[in-house]
Amino acid sequence: MPRPPLPAHLLELLRRPNPCVIATLRPDGQPVTVATWYLLDTDDRILVNMDAGRRRLEYIRQDPRVSLTVLDGDDWSTHVSVQGRLVDLTDDNDLADIDRIAIHYIGHPYPNRSRGRVSGWIDTDFWHAWGPGAKPQS
């Protein structure tokens, strides 16, 4: 699998509010996947945000390796998957990070203001892309 940086056409795919799935590892090594939102924060870091009470947060604290697969919302046969580590876990006390992600996806701040949130950034180690939209346009 290629290492970063990702090519410009894949960064463009990641800049859009596409559907995606994140995989974490349970302590017994079993992978767990869940749909999530993300935001390409810089060209090599992806922001994700979790409810502070979610079990996957415990898994990430024990083993920060994750995989994120982003599907092109216009053609789900096109996708990019990144494997890396979820780093810099921080409490999102003022909900600024989840609001940035929510505005990206739904156009307004995150509606549930009563539960704690935690932000983390995926540092990409490897990536893989597939499908017509994963190839550079000539």
Predicted regions and their residues:
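Short beta-strand segments
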Residues: 17-52, 67-70, 81-82
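Extreme N-terminal tail/first-helix region
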Residues: 1-17
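Charged, gly/pro-rich active-site loop segments
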Residues: 1-5, 77-138
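Ligand-binding loop in jelly-roll beta-barrel domains
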Residues: 63-64
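A short beta-turn/loop motif at secondary-structure boundaries
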Residues: 28-30, 73-76, 114
